[in-house]
Amino acid sequence: MKETRGYGGDAPFCTRLNHSYTGMWAPERSAEARGNLTRPPGSGEDCGSVSVAFPITMLLTGFVGNALAMLLVSRSYRRRESKRKKSFLLCIGWLALTDLVGQLLTTPVVIVVYLSKQRWEHIDPSGRLCTFFGLTMTVFGLSSLFIASAMAVERALAIRAPHWYASHMKTRATRAVLLGVWLAVLAFALLPVLGVGQYTVQWPGTWCFISTGRGGNGTSSSHNWGNLFFASAFAFLGLLALTVTFSCNLATIKALVSRCRAKATASQSSAQWGRITTETAIQLMGIMCVLSVCWSPLLIMMLKMIFNQTSVEHCKTHTEKQKECNFFLIAVRLASLNQILDPWVYLLLRKILLRKFCQIRYHTNNYASSSTSLPCQCSSTLMWSDHLER
């Protein structure tokens, strides 16, 4: 998910927002509001970070990470003989595919808006592109959150109820759950097309997302409540997905710690379980931190704007609301960052760190002892780690 930015003329992005710019919102502002936004030349914000390089960099890094994750998952999936071990790989692959497709559908729009140097209405006079952009952000944003929740539930069941998991968790069931998540989110995102909710151009008039406030004076009461319902439902569904993910991950960590303490007989096995438990706990906490940082600001900000009845309409005419709308823009950027971080926190970074850990221990052992058993222990650690993930 990327926010779109554009130019309302030849003026830089930040400057045109801070000066008496007659671009995106000017026709709808009052004379007083336009006067409040007028500043002397040279007083604009630093625009060094606003560039077409931003969406291009996000696209390239996201494409590389998700494509690499899909490649590794595909190779591992074909090698696995046990069907129940494929559930985790299916979830990882589906998550990477969801993030990758979401980027490919939104980022080209971002780049076109940048390079066209025009207002959104000039590029999309019918409003269909705005609807498509908002729908895409909603579908692939919520899908990523609920796929992460499904992975957390799968992991918790594999650790806390291994016998039930082995007999009931089949590959077909995993596929059905993932497909059901995607179809359910798509049905939800189509509600504005049916008249419940609305996708609108957001502040500063250069990207589209769910409207968080009531419509204008010409809209009916049912349409206004439809907007509030849809925006609130999106925020609460996102928070629900985060809650499920956090609860299941904490339950998994607790189960791993209990199992590690139970391994008191064999010292080597106990030490190995201790390392695996620590590594897995760190990864799960990293996942929770990434999800919190990337998604909590957007979801909480949406609820705050709904409660305060703040929307893009207020940003057009009330200068005191622009700070809140700018925070909302930053929150969307954080959510878009999650698509880049997902493959790393779930798969790529863990494999890199585990192999580096084994290499360091192997070289350290060469200095301390001539034993050659450590490489086997490292291979065993990776094997046990893969087993825990599945």
Curated annotation (Swiss-Prot):
InterPro entries: EP3_rcpt_2, GPCR_Rhodpsn, GPCR_Rhodpsn_7TM, Prostanoid_rcpt, Prostglndn_DP_rcpt, Prostglndn_EP3_rcpt. Glycans are attached at residues 18, 36. It holds the Pfam family 7tm_1. Receptor for prostaglandin E2 (PGE2). The activity of this receptor can couple to both the inhibition of adenylate cyclase mediated by G(i) proteins, and to an elevation of intracellular calcium. Required for normal development of fever in response to pyrinogens, including IL1B, prostaglandin E2 and bacterial lipopolysaccharide (LPS). Required for normal potentiation of platelet aggregation by prostaglandin E2, and thus plays a role in the regulation of blood coagulation. Interacts (via C-terminus) with MKLN1. Belongs to the G-protein coupled receptor 1 family. This is Prostaglandin E2 receptor EP3 subtype.
